[in-house]
């Protein structure tokens, strides 16, 4: 009951108290392992893999294209209805959550073993295919673990405690998959590092076999509000869902086919060269954003318009009678309904909101995949040095940035903090531009504050200062952005709306990585860092517009309250 008391009082334990609590309860102990199982593949596939490729002299344009596997995490909500509803043959006796977890964890173990048996210099297409399979398996595992956490929560293991323990396990995995992997790479080969990580992943299957599962009946009997009188007709919803689905399928096919062609060694029949990443991004990038963001918003707005005019709505309850119909309702709730509510509540202001969401973290997302190649290959730091600076020291700097963001939010408010976060996130890229250009400004800063007198050589101090600036800015901006997303999310659709909007954060940055990698290959790191800092001004502009929009909305709301109060006083006077 200690866990329940802590959750009720709001005193969620941390650090060693949290670990002690996790080891004292079956569900919390398994949640700790599941957090590790979720964090390890993400760290290895999205971050550490780029260190391996950079050291083995894979060009940055190729690394950028391969980084598109991260889109699997951004858009895992697309197949979450399938994972939630479909029973896996021959594994059903394990339960609806454990059966999916076993498949994902076996695939992830095979992924790391498969990568360890591949040479990306000679088998890039095969290497990329294995990484793609691993990313989809990892993203699917995240969906299942999130559902399991909610399903098994009870008084002895409240969801707040389970969530904290999940984050604890995730951070342990980030240290092992990041810092430990880099340290090991200085002593053994990269293939051996990934084989060892495959062994760690295989151990998580034991926790899955020991985990309790949840019954399906209660969810399957639940009648969706989408089937009640006054809702849009299922037939029309199916048409809208089909339109949105086709847009998503086209976007996924376009990105996937380009990845296959480039990483598989295909050449342009006219030029005789590999496909140009920059040309692809300029030609298809805007259309991909239109198909995955603008088209669903238009469909959602159309349904709002029809519902307001009582067109094509149910006149009586019409419960779903098949698994396919329930899955369609679930997909509609994940893809269209959250945007529909946002459009209805904000109106045309949704254009500003979506623009802000798409651009706010772009300065971090668009070049993050090249951080390890930059440190290890360009600047010639060792794996031990990068492990300490990025994965240990950098974590504390990020936590400091988050604390600063929280303090600013409490003192100066949401929108000023959001604006400052956008500015410092863009400006932090200029620190890396200086580092890539010889660190003249960084050296001056270090000497002014005598930072090179604390037992570190100036070369290491440069890296620590750059990572400090980037991580503090990123932590501040991240805290401000999470607070902003939470503020615009409807309580009615909190989970699905937040998941959808937060996933859009990664879209533009992920699509732009390949073009950024190609640009670095051609003109070097420093000009690209300056350009990404300039791109960050787009987010600054959207924050200013959103600040104006929210101020006007608050003014209108205040005026409405005054009019209502005046009307109430007049009514009281008439009664008297």
Where are the regions that the model predicts?
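Loop-to-transmembrane helix entry/capping segments in MFS-fold secondary transporters
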Residues: 60-61, 150, 154-165, 383-385, ...
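A late C-terminal transmembrane helix in Major Facilitator Superfamily
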Residues: 395, 488-522
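Helix-to-loop junctions at the C-terminal end of transmembrane segments
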Residues: 76-93, 185, 400-420, 520-521
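C-terminal ends and interior cores of transmembrane alpha-helices
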Residues: 100-121, 423-456
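Intracellular juxtamembrane helix-capping segments at the cytosolic ends
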Residues: 139-153, 475-490
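Transmembrane alpha-helices of Major Facilitator/SLC transporters
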Residues: 72-79, 291-301, 386-410, 421, ...
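Intracellular loop-helix junctions on the cytosolic face of multi-pass helical membrane proteins
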Residues: 1-25, 116-128, 154-356, 543-576
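Short amphipathic helix-loop junctions that connect adjacent transmembrane helices
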Residues: 47-63, 261-280, 360, 369-387
């Amino acid at each position: 009951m200690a866990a329940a008391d802590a959750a009720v009082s709001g005193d969620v334990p941390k650090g060693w108290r949290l670990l002690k609590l996790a080891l004292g309860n079956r569900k919390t102990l398994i949640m700790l392992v599941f957090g590790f199982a979720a964090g390890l593949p993400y760290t290895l596939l999205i971050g550490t893999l780029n260190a391996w490729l950079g050291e083995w002299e894979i060009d940055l344009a190729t690394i950028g294209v391969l980084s598109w596997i991260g889109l699997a995490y951004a858009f895992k909500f697309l197949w979450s209805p399938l994972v939630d509803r479909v029973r896996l043959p021959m594994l059903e006796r394990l339960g609806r959550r454990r059966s999916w977890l076993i498949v994902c964890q076996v695939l992830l173990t095979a992924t790391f073993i498969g990568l360890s048996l591949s040479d990306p210099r000679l088998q890039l297409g095969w290497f990329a295919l294995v990484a793609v399979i691993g990313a989809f398996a990892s993203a699917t595992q995240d969906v299942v673990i999130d559902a399991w956490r909610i399903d098994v929560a009870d008084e002895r293991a409240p969801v707040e405690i389970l969530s904290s323990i999940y984050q604890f396990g995730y951070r342990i995995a980030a240290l092992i998959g990041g810092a430990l992997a880099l340290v090991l790479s200085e002593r053994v080969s990269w293939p051996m590092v990934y084989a060892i990580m495959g062994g760690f992943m295989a151990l998580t299957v034991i926790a899955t076999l020991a985990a309790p599962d949840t019954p399906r009946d209660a969810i399957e009997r639940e009648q969706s509000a989408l089937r009640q009188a006054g809702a849009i007709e299922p037939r029309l919803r199916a048409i809208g869902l089909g339109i949105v689905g086709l847009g998503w399928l086209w976007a996924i096919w376009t990105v996937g086919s380009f990845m296959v062609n480039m990483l598989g060694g295909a050449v342009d029949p006219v030029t005789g060269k590999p496909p140009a990443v920059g040309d692809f991004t300029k030609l298809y990038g805007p259309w991909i954003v239109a198909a995955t963001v603008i088209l669903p918003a238009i469909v959602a707005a159309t349904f709002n318009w029809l519902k307001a005019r009582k067109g094509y709505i149910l006149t009586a309850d019409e419960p779903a009678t098949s698994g396919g119909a329930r899955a369609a309702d679930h997909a509609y709730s994940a893809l269209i309904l959250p945007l529909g509510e946002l459009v209805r509540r904000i109106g045309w202001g949704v254009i500003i909101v979506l623009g802000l969401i798409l651009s706010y973290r772009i300065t971090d997302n668009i070049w993050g995949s090249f951080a390890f190649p930059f440190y290890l290959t360009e600047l010639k730091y060792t794996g031990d040095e990068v492990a300490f600076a990025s994965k240990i020291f950098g974590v504390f700097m990020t936590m400091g940035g988050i604390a600063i963001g929280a303090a600013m939010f409490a003192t100066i408010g949401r929108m000023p903090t959001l604006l400052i976060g956008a500015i410092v996130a863009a400006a932090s890229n200029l620190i890396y531009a200086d580092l890539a250009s010889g660190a003249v400004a960084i050296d001056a800063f270090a000497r002014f504050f005598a930072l090179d007198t604390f037992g570190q050589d100036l070369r290491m101090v440069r890296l620590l200062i750059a990572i400090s600036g980037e991580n503090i800015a990123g932590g501040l901006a991240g805290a401000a952005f999470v607070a902003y997303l939470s503020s615009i999310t409807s309580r009615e659709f909190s989970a699905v709306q937040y998941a959808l909007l937060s996933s859009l954060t990664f879209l533009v940055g992920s699509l732009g990585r390949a073009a950024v990698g190609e640009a670095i290959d051609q003109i070097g790191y420093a000009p690209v860092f300056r350009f990404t800092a300039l791109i960050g001004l787009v987010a600054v502009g959207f924050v200013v517009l959103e600040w104006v929009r929210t101020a006007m909305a608050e003014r209108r709301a205040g005026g409405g309250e005054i009019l209502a109060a005046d009307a109430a006083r007049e009514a009281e006077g008439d009664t008297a």
